[in-house]
UniProtKB/Swiss-Prot annotation:
Transmembrane segments: none annotated. NCBIfam families: PPR. PPR repeats lie at residues 372-406, 407-441, 442-476, 477-511, 512-542, 544-574, 578-612. GO terms for cellular component: mitochondrion. It holds the Pfam family PPR_long. This is Pentatricopeptide repeat-containing protein At4g04790, mitochondrial.
Length: 821
């Protein structure tokens, strides 16, 4: 049955329990003319009414003004609405806590408008309109022009309906939006529009996840009527439905249609049934079906890949080998053997990369087939995803030796992996690979190589790559020069950076907004900032958000704080960027001594309920005045919503308290936030290491605070203190000449099951010397191995620094700081 207001109560109770909310995404964009937009929607989006006029009018009048509808026209227009869709509530009920990140990520990947630029653009427009007018007004407005909507607009609107349903934890609200999406599908059918899988797939996936069987079939019927060619693909979703519900009888009914004894190829519908079974690892049903299916009759390459992924996940070597031999002996199947070997070998659970490569090579040898470029590409990507970049480079070099083409995608995987593992020196091997004839790079590959060369300060290599472009019939672009420009600025080599700009012009490459952003951001004089900004305008380069950010940073760095503030009032600055630019201004002012001004801007934004970048709030905490109130920083930390930002800001506030003699409330603050500190996935232990380091370097040492924190970690949080924590605390005992607490810390090493290494012995030795226990120090030092010259040196320096000289004026003691690494 179709979801409607009269039958909502008939839905299964499972639906209500499965409503999964998420956070609201704020996407805003300008309303420019877009190809494929119906004239009615264009007229709606091109309204010239000012925001002030709209604010003064009622919600109903605001929508009427946008649509250019007079009061007298409303009643007649409303009678002729094409879609009879109930109005929305103005605000969306959200509850973030009940929806997992994994499900959110999975649904984002299925988003209707993700694969189509126009649909994505329209979705932004719909969201932006809802944000400004309210959802009720926005959907009512677009409802008025529904008769003239294009396919692209239908698709985008369906996507927004689904998104709102997914985000809500309100049953009626979610059902209402699914009903509206259904009405749009019916409208598309009635107008003769095809409904594509990228539109109906996420809708059916949502219904499957909510156990809505009747609704699933209603949607499926409309889709089949609108797009008869989708019948076979709808079988895939039907199989997913029964798998999700665990209905073995229905699954078996569909499986019974798959017969491999007739010698004919599988139908498209049968292949879709098999594909769903493989996707969901239905081992019981697949075990029987794969015995009767003729693998050489499978026409879908996607199904073949999924079959071998399934076989790899369950390590079904004998079945995989049989299928590969059958394909090897067939005229068409032999073309796929190498690719299927790579899929199978890389899907085997828990192997090392080395084992995977051995299996890859062995299977190719047994089947007497040569590895293909695409199979090597899969192997390279697998190695890169496993962070085995050196191994991936070895594979690529073998490809070159075999004369196989090294594609731009392979180079991209390598370059991305090098960036991820921070082994920038490996770019030199990429450079040597590029010298072979079997490489087909693109401009993005060159840009990445040039950027990595600058990271290792190999500017000569970066310029060599620019020279190599002509060997591949490629032209240099501004992004390549910008990488070199950024590298020189990073090295504070301004003269060479300016030379890059000159070289760009000589090469016929026009500087872009990023180029001017780098130039402005690295200016230290107001006149230079003005010069580059004027040059940018004369060159016809449009000022972007990044340019305005660079202006703010540059003016603040040159001490022109009022100029930095004036950037925000520039009439050319889009209103949509105001909050981001204010956040940048807060960070720029706070980091350059204008903390009070930064705090004032933040408080104004907070009162206006504007979004502030968490990094800006953290900057306020980090650069706060040492004479400031701790309560202000506590409030700032509390304002941080997401856990990652909060933990960063909270512990920066704790560090401020330790370093500025405001530590009396630290333990209370920790206890107050105990629940949040215990949240899974928050790296609390590493932050405690920093706090103990601050305690160790503070004069006078706050050993009592350190011991209180140690007890809190153990008793309240259930943490085992790290070795670093104990090392820093023991060092604090040295500074405080506190033998009593030093001995307690020494016992903590044993409680935490940390073996006392040489560094631990040396620190305890220093505690004994500093506290004047020469006998204890002598006994302990006898147990320290003295084979290492550095250890001998530290012992001698410690004896000198802590020796007693009662008849002479004591010089300031030199501290021997030991590494905690």
């Amino acid at each position: 049955m179709v979801v409607s207001k009269v039958n909502k109560s008939l839905l299964s109770s499972v639906f209500k329990s499965r409503i999964r909310p998420t956070g609201e995404s704020s996407i805003a964009s300008g309303n420019k003319d877009i190809a494929g937009t119906s004239q009615a929607v264009k007229d709606l989006l091109s309204s010239k009414n000012s925001s002030s006029d709209l604010e003064e009018a009622s919600l109903q009048d605001r929508v009427s003004k946008l649509l250019h509808v007079t009061t007298s026209d409303k009643s007649s227009l409303e009678k002729n609405l094409f879609l009879k869709i109930p109005s929305f509530t103005t605000k969306i009920p959200y509850d973030i806590s009940l929806r997992t990140k994994e499900l959110s990520r999975e649904r984002k990947e299925r988003r209707v408008y993700k694969q189509n630029g126009l649909s994505r653009r329209f979705a932004k427009i719909f969201r932006d309109s809802a944000q400004k007018l309210g959802t009720e007004a926005m959907f009512g407005a677009f409802d008025r022009v529904a008769k003239e909507m294009s396919v692209t607009e239908y698709n985008a609107m369906i996507g927004v309906y689904l998104e709102h349903a997914e985000k809500s934890n309100d049953l009626d609200y979610a059902l209402g939006h699914i009903e509206k999406a259904f009405e749009l599908l019916k409208s598309m059918r009635d107008r003769g529009f095809l409904i594509e899988e990228r539109v109906y797939g996420p809708l059916l996936g949502y219904l499957i996840g909510m156990d809505m069987v009747d609704e699933f079939h209603s949607f499926k019927d409309v889709i089949r009527e609108a797009s008869p060619g989708s019948v076979e693909r709808l079988g895939y979703y039907e199989m997913l439905l029964w798998i999700h519900l665990g209905d073995g009888e229905k699954i078996e009914e569909l499986c019974s249609t798959i017969d491999g004894d007739n010698g004919e190829s599988l139908s498209v519908l049968q292949e879709n049934y098999l594909l769903a079974l493989c996707k969901k690892d239905q081992k019981y049903h697949l075990e029987r079906l794969l015995e009767i299916v003729d693998i050489t009759k499978v026409r879908s390459s996607d199904l073949l890949a999924n079959i071998f992924e399934y076989l790899g996940r369950f390590s079904l070597d004998s079945v995989a080998s049989r299928f590969l031999w059958e394909l090897r002996e067939s005229d068409e199947g032999v073309k796929n053997v190498s690719d299927l070997i790579s899929i199978y070998s890389t899907c085997t659970p828990n192997p090392t990369v080395e084992d995977t490569i051995l299996k890859f090579n062995k299977m190719h040898e047994e089947l007497d087939v040569m590895p293909s470029s695409t199979s090597y590409e899969k192997l390279v990507k697998y190695s890169c995803d496993s962070n085995e970049v050196v191994t991936a480079l070895d594979v690529v070099e073998k490809m070159g030796e075999a004369g196989l083409m090294i594609s731009a995608d392979i180079l991209h995987s390598l370059l991305h992996a090098i960036d991820e593992v921070l082994e920038f020196d490996l770019v030199r091997r990429i450079h040597s690979i590029m010298c072979t004839k079997s490489v087909k790079p693109n401009t993005e590959n060159f840009r990445s190589i040039i950027r990595l060369c600058t990271r290792i300060k190999d500017f000569e290599g970066a310029y060599n790559m620019l020279g190599n472009l002509k060997n591949f019939n490629l032209e240099p672009n501004s992004s390549m020069f910008n990488c070199i420009l950024a590298g020189y600025f990073r090295e504070k080599n301004v003269s060479s950076a300016l030379m890059v700009v000159k070289q760009m012009k000589e090469a016929g490459v026009k500087p872009d907004s990023i180029t001017f952003g780098y130039l402005i951001n690295n200016c230290t004089q107001e006149d230079a900032i003005t010069k580059y900004y004027e040059e940018m305008k004369q060159a016809g380069v449009q000022a972007t958000k990044r340019i305005y950010m660079s202006l703010i940073d540059a003016y603040a760095a040159s001490g022109k704080f009022e100029k930095a503030k004036q950037v925000l009032v520039d009439p050319d600055v889009p209103a949509i960027n105001q909050n981001e630019l204010k956040s940048v201004l807060i960070s720029a002012l706070a980091s350059r001594g204008k903390w009070a001004d930064a705090l004032h801007i933040y408080e104004e934004m907070r009162k206006a309920e504007c979004h502030v970048d968490p990094k800006s709030i953290i900057s306020l905490i980090e650069y706060s005045d040492s004479k400031g109130e701790l309560s202000t920083l506590v409030q700032l930390a509390d304002d941080l919503q997401d856990d990652t930002s909060w933990i960063d800001g909270f512990f920066r506030m704790i560090l401020f308290a330790v370093r500025n003699k405001k530590s009396s409330d630290i333990v209370d603050l920790l206890k107050r936030n105990k629940v949040r500190l215990l949240k899974k996935g928050i790296p609390v232990e590493a932050h405690f290491d920093e706090v103990f380091w601050a305690i160790a370097e503070t004069e006078p040492s706050k050993v009592h605070l350190g011991m209180d924190l140690l007890r809190f970690m153990k008793d309240e949080l259930g943490f085992v203190p790290s070795r670093k924590c104990l090392d820093f605390l023991l060092h604090a005992c040295v500074n405080a000449k506190d033998l009593e607490h030093g001995l307690l810390v020494w016992k903590e090493y044993q409680s935490a099951a940390f073996p006392c290494n040489v560094l631990s012995f040396l620190r305890m030795y220093q505690v004994l010397l500093a506290a004047g226990d020469s006998e204890g120090a002598k006994a302990l030092v006898s147990k320290i191995p003295k084979d290492d010259k550095d250890v001998q040196h530290i012992i001698e320096e410690s004896q000198s620094a802590f020796s007693q000289a009662p008849n002479k004026k004591k010089p300031k003691k030199k501290m021997i700081v030991l590494s905690t690494k």
